[in-house]
């Protein structure tokens, strides 16, 4: 069996979500950098031309959640990142959905300034921030950051999604307000500090910061 290949990009939160899962599960893999848009050339790897995607022997798969679920099933002896309890597993997927479809999708509408030196219109910012804060309130209602990990004592894919997305969102939006737009996310700062004592999260976050700040400098920020 060949070593698993992860095709992705250091700043991509979806690539980093998969990378965190691989590191936490201690699955051997090799990274192949693919810049956004470049993957249109490889229809086998990603039918929609999106990153990340993986190659495991002759099997290709894209979509970060699909990949993470595949890793859980294909490597049953590795550290589990999906709770065995059906209700907890469903809660995990709910948290991931809030992070990715509400917070991340809202943030993407307004952090173009940081990377491309083009600020969105004020009304776009306000609309997107309202949606982002809706996601923050949802995570607070679920007490996501009140324990050592999001769903209790054990790390899950929800933690991979959170640590891949929330630090990026916070940094990318730092030009837009004197305070973090995630300042009302209860317990998040302490949660981030805990995760940054653990090697997989240190590795991924440090690499993300280095690449992101390089992009921001080139954009003149």
Where are these regions (language model features)?
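Acidic/histidine-enriched, glycine/proline-rich intrinsically disordered or flexible terminal extensions
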Residues: 207-221
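GST-like fold's C-terminal all-alpha helical module
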Residues: 103-197
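GST-like domain detector, emphasizing the conserved glutathione-binding G-site
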Residues: 1-126, 145, 150
